[in-house]
From Swiss-Prot:
Pfam families referenced in this protein's UniProt entry, alphabetically: ATP_bind_1 (PF03029)
Biased composition (Acidic residues): 263-275
Binding site for GTP: G13, S14, G15, K16, S17, T18, T172, K173, I174, D175
Region called Disordered, residue ranges: 253-276
Family the entry assigns: Belongs to the GPN-loop GTPase family.
Function as written in the Swiss-Prot or TrEMBL entry: Small GTPase required for proper localization of RNA polymerase II (RNAPII). May act at an RNAP assembly step prior to nuclear import.
Motif Gly-Pro-Asn (GPN)-loop per record, residues: 70-72
InterPro entries: Gpn, Gpn3, P-loop_NTPase
Name under which the protein is recorded: GPN-loop GTPase 3
């Protein structure tokens, strides 16, 4: 079936680790073997079993102690160190034919928008035979109004344009909002018309921003980036719909051979139908 990757991204607090663990458990339930890769050199506690861990190569604490960097500088250095040692990652991933990886990435947005670390990582994964889908998580509680939605959408756009791979935007923590009145606010963003968004933004902002609102709306519409897949981790159907979106984007399972029905059963069914017809004909004679 080939080798496939979910590259799980999103700002801190968007639920990346919870997503990875939930998706792993769901895949196990549907008999799909997955491996989780931790690429956050600052991660301390895992909610899931880790198959490959960047901290076996480098940690942020080590960088901060040895080079006296701050947390963000230490993270960037650690990720650049990974890029310089891609052979380590290749060896850790192995060379299996049917790999399905879920890669838990750091949350610092500069890794996707300012420096080429994640793009180099994606290119390397593709070179060694992986089909990659970027899964960008946004906390649904973060986009409860139009301005916040624009901010979240532009953040997704930055990662999508930078990486140039199939891209799925996910609204997380829907299960939290379902029990509150705020869920109605989220629903309008799930099937949003850009023109309506621009009109509402114009009502909320000064006249001098109206041209900018229109330009941003056109940008999002041109890139078809107003679509988010809602995720309720307590709902199996929600997980199934999201996984189907991801699978379609990386063509997972398309090379599977269709199963043919057993011939013996078909023959038996045909014989039964023939006997019944003969009995009916005899009864009418």
């Amino acid at each position: 079936m080939g080798k496939h990757v979910q590259l799980v991204m999103g700002p801190a607090g968007s639920g990346k680790s919870t997503y990875c663990d939930t998706m792993r458990k769901y895949c196990e339930e549907i008999k799909r073997s997955v491996h989780i890769v931790n690429l956050d050199p600052a991660a301390e506690v895992f909610e899931y079993p880790v198959s490959v861990d960047i901290k076996n190569l480098v940690t942020v604490d080590e960088v901060m102690d040895e080079l006296h960097y701050g947390p963000n500088g230490g993270l960037v250095y650690a990720m650049e160190y990974l890029i310089e040692n891609m052979d380590w990652l290749t060896d850790e991933l192995g060379d299996y034919e049917d790999d399905y990886l879920i890669i838990d990435c750091p949350g610092q947005i500069e890794l996707y928008s300012h420096i080429p670390v994640m793009r180099i990582l994606v290119d390397h994964l593709q070179q060694i035979g992986y089909s990659v889908c970027s899964v960008f998580l946004v906390d649904s509680q973060f986009i409860l109004d139009n301005c916040k939605f624009i901010s979240g959408a532009l953040m997704c756009l930055s990662a999508m344009v930078r990486l140039e791979v199939p891209h799925i935007n996910v609204l997380t923590k829907i299960d939290v909002l379902k029990t509150s009145d705020q869920y109605k606010e989220i629903e309008k963003f799930l099937d949003l018309e850009v023109q309506n968004l621009v009109e509402e933004l114009n009502l909320e902002t000064h006249d001098r921003y109206h041209r900018m609102n229109k330009a941003i709306g056109s940008l999002l519409e041109d890139f078809s980036l107003v679509g988010f897949v809602p995720l309720d981790i307590t709902d199996q159907e929600s997980l199934n719909v999201l996984l189907q979106h991801i699978d379609n984007s990386i063509q997972y399972g398309e090379d599977l051979e269709p199963k043919e029905p057993p011939l013996e059963n078909d023959d038996d069914d045909d014989d039964d139908e023939g006997d019944e017809i003969i009995r009916m004909m005899n009864g009418n004679l």
